[in-house]
Amino acid sequence: MSNQQHTLYLFTRYLIYVKITSMKRYYKKIVFIICIIVIFLGCSDTDTFSNRTLTAEQNKNHIISLAELYSYIKEYSPFLNDVILNNLNEKYFELSNKIMYESDKYKIYTYFEELLAVINDGHTAVFYEQGSNTPFYFLPAGVDYADGKYYLSYKENNIKIPLGSELIKINDEDTKKYLLNNIAKYIPVKTPHAFENSMIKRLLYSSQNKKIKFTFEVDKNEVNLELKYSIPQKNIGNVKFNKIPDYYDKLNKIYSSYNFSIYKIKEKYALIQIHNFWDYRMIDEFIEKIIPLLENSDHLILDIRKNSGSNSSIGFAILKILTGKTDIEISSINIKDFQRRLTPILITLAAIKDTNLKVINHDTLIKLNTFINDAKLMKAHQLLMSAEEDKILQQIDNFLMQFNEMEKLEEKLISAANKYKIHNKNITVFTSYKSGSACDNFACFCKELNIRLIGTNTKGATGNIGIFKLTNNFSIVLSLQKTMYNNMEINNKGISPDVFIMDTIEDIKNQNDPCLNFVLENL
């Protein structure tokens, strides 16, 4: 190890292990470390080190950003304990050495994934810089997870292996073993089944032209399929794959939109597939479009198995309408270890505006400009005292209540529940390990309202999040709290169903829905 590298080693370890007594001092130390890194980038006389120095100079923003991510985790993650903190420190030191001389953009991205995955926060994510060409390439075939096994779920026309064939090996190694050895390090969620499902989804993209070998079982024989990561991310949505038909495809659909699909199952039975909990405007759609279709159904099935989550309040509002319990409050769901809140909330508001996310309407964002401008200053971790934080948070909350018309929403709920009086209906909810975020909370609400859950545990990845923009223009999502239900942590456990049912590969191939079959046979 050269003197320069040894100096960098010492200063990096100093960053990791010195106890920081204030965030102001902490920020100064980070800046000091970065300055040392930059100073030592050009101090070798050898050609080899000069070439590596050139890469390090080009990677300066990534080096700084990895340090930023490390500091954000240390400051805001509610999931740190002695074991996780030790793993975080070791992983940061390992990756900070790797990233300095890494030229592959895809690998650089994975280093941020790895650092995030250490803290076991299933709600975390890293997003590549917006507006740039991502280094992600997809396979011309896809695999999925069901009941402990993996199978071919879609493919291009020239692939002859039958859909639904079980994947038994990857690169001549047992599938599960390969995923644990090569993919698990990128996966933050640890909930059973959600973890396995996330691994196989993560396998579907990698760096350009990387090759991979799949071995499927077809008619009791092993059949190999060699593939290349060749489809750019920007094109993947335009590729027409052959897919296994969904079991929804054979149901009688009577309504469809971005937010909902309604199916008439049989006389007096309706299935409402809720695709997301994204936007308060979907409450208007639910009241005006969906409820009139449900009046003649005594049995309602709410399906959130493929729900992408977002805002828990939306799900709670839907349940209030359906049950008629418009004044109910859920006290069994609470938060724990909520870290310093104001800075990430302000930074998140700034990120929402900067990236044009459609979660807050434009007029409201304009009125929040004062707070958003404060967020630019807060990036230096110049935190306020707790009492001052609470005061400003209350101002923001009141502002959002006023301009996002929350009070009007409550009035709509009460009016709809009284008008349609559908709360005497039998309600069942289908859950899955694929549905987290607001779906975890939705399942909690159902438990409190004695609504039966059928399916698997939810994903176990919920809670308020902060969005942090890094120097290299990556965006990072971090949980800011632990969410508890009846004093049990939801993270990496999920909410358990009343009746556990999981699809098998045969169910999926045959368009058979065991959850729906159970309801029809037992009600």
Report residues per predicted region:
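Gram-negative bacterial Sec-dependent N-terminal signal peptides
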Residues: I33-I36
